[in-house]
Amino acid sequence: MKVSLIGAGNIGGTLAYLIASKKLASEVELIDVNGDLARGKALDVSQTLPLIGYTMKINGSANMERIKGSSVIIITAGIPRKPGMTREELIDVNAVVMKEVGEKIKKFAPKAFVIVVTNPLDVMVWVLYKAAEISPDKIVGMAGVLDASRMNLFLAQELGVSVADVKSLVLGSHGDSMVPLFRHSTVSGMSLPELVSVGLITKDKVDSIIERTRSGGAEIVALLKTGSAYYTPAASVLEMAEAYLLDQKKTLVCSVMMRGRYGVEDDIFSGIPVIMGSGGVERVIELDLTPDERRMFENSVAATRKLVLEARKYF
């Protein structure tokens, strides 16, 4: 199986290594406008193969035509955030990149399963979907998998438990209006409301963890100063790609086409739980949201809708 990575920056390079280390594909194409950067990272990852004990092809190029025959295409290309920037401030620059990439996918790999990572995430998935004209169930954005991982860590640290025992659920946009679901998040099977009721954690502490989850990316951007997070985004995308390539039928929160789902009637993308397998988005899980949860989710979708209006000028 062939996986193409569009963008050879920190996330793209990390993904190339993770795919090789997990022996997930027989061929990886690492593509970047800076061909030497792509070739250099491809060569570096290739030299780990004897240590991994796995034979595969890892190529670096600036030529988008090399995405032909890809089973999965992962897009990380674009400008990352700098300290003080919001994801939304990247729209004008990254929408142009997404449109160009989408047109190439339409021409060279229209049957590939596409995962978008570029921010502002939900808007960029929409731009690429419009440009590539592919099935809505064959394109997703990396959203809730990353956000839930951050929330899982913060809860585990606060409670002093294994991260493996914590399961969080974060819906909505991959941005400040994301919706971490308090009552659907669990620790060893106990919901957060139950943990609060028995005094293992306070509601105020849970609220502070939710806020830290919302600003988790910005916290890292402020510390790095020259870029944004890449290890956890890469690991999150890998989980999504595995679910597709290995037909795992795995429940993941991804940014998907919302039309006809959760009461949304237009072509907006947002994060909801889906079953991911070899058919792409094979099924949507419609959660029974409380009035407050639904209001927050609708506000999140509305925030994305407003940004999509800005991106429509490119079509």
From Swiss-Prot:
Its EC number is 1.1.1.37. It catalyses: (S)-malate + NAD(+) = oxaloacetate + NADH + H(+). One of its GO terms (biological process) is tricarboxylic acid cycle. NAD(+) binds at residues 7-12, 32, 94, 117-119. The active site is at residue 174. One of its GO terms (molecular function) is L-malate dehydrogenase (NAD+) activity. It is an enzyme of class 1 (oxidoreductase). InterPro entries: L-lactate/malate_DH, Lactate/malate_DH_C, Lactate/malate_DH_N, Lactate_DH/Glyco_Ohase_4_C, Malate_DH_type3, NAD(P)-bd_dom_sf. Keywords: NAD, Oxidoreductase, Tricarboxylic acid cycle. Substrate binds at residues 81, 87, 119, 150. Belongs to the LDH/MDH superfamily. MDH type 3 family. HAMAP family: Malate_dehydrog_3. Catalyzes the reversible oxidation of malate to oxaloacetate. This is Malate dehydrogenase. It comes from Neorickettsia sennetsu (strain ATCC VR-367 / Miyayama).
